[in-house]
């Protein structure tokens, strides 16, 4: 199971769906409210049978024993009998995009008898060699759909431009736009 929060969870959801179609047992626990961090809700959502967890953070805390979400998850399992193996990972450093291939690498790492801890995905770490290896590029989305995600800064025209684009696509093509 991967524990993460933020926009990366959408990529992980696509990856989970892709792997589930192949019969691979993987999961995602998406954190929506980080503080206060709820032990009750975490354990209600986490399967009791989980054996290995990768906690992904999009931050680097120099000098700390681990990144914030990772440390919180580790603390929840501290002293618990039959606690799962918990490893830390970083993604999206240097504003790098996160891809389904990278999430597959995380799940493959978890499948190892001794998963790599404190790994990175999305950058090639040729200094400390913490990067997970990537395999071939995959398409984890729906083959029959086209998806776009636009970000705007507010009052920059993004919303209006996208509404117009969606209207044109819906009116002038045989595609369903929403």
Report the location of each language-model feature:
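Peripheral docking tails and interdomain loops at the edges
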Residues: 52-141
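Generic structural "secondary-structure junction" signal
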Residues: 35-39, 121-123, 161
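Anionic-ligand anchoring segments at beta-strand to alpha-helix junctions in alpha/beta enzyme folds, i.e.
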Residues: 3-35, 144-178
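Glycine-rich, anion-gripping cofactor-binding loops and their flanking helix/strand elements
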Residues: 9, 13, 21, 28-65, ...
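Alpha-helical structural signal in soluble globular domains
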Residues: 15-18, 45, 72-80, 168
